[in-house]
Amino acid sequence: MIQAMHAHLLPLVLLAGCAGAPMPADELARLDLDDLVAEACSPAAREPEYARHDASYRPAIIHELAQRLGWQPADVRRVTARQVWVGATREQVLAAWGRPWSTLRQVSRAGELQVWTYGRPVGPQSFVELLAERCISVTSYDR
């Protein structure tokens, strides 16, 4: 009887547990690098229309990444402005633009080339080429 009475609360509990709320700075500091980059790509950090978006969250993540990875002040400004440039690291591209729509991986004597596509096939698109986890090319165009 008790199970049946409270069964309607279960979806609410699960939703609250799954929702990506911004983490406090001390929790960000404890994340490993991959989890911190994933957090930079999260809706709470990237999407103003997200219910739990906090405008101060993305700068806190970028600050933590910059400290750990030794980013130059100019690079921090570019990532904060959502810019990607030739020479940017994989982490800087992800923190600036988030996860790509699709990826292509090619291995050759030169190393592993990755082409990250941002944007859907029917609208504006950008392509970021990474070699050895560094941006070597950024191409954008409208369709």
Task: Please give the residue ranges for each predicted region.
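C-terminal motif of bacterial Sec signal peptides marking the signal peptidase cleavage site
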Residues: 15-17
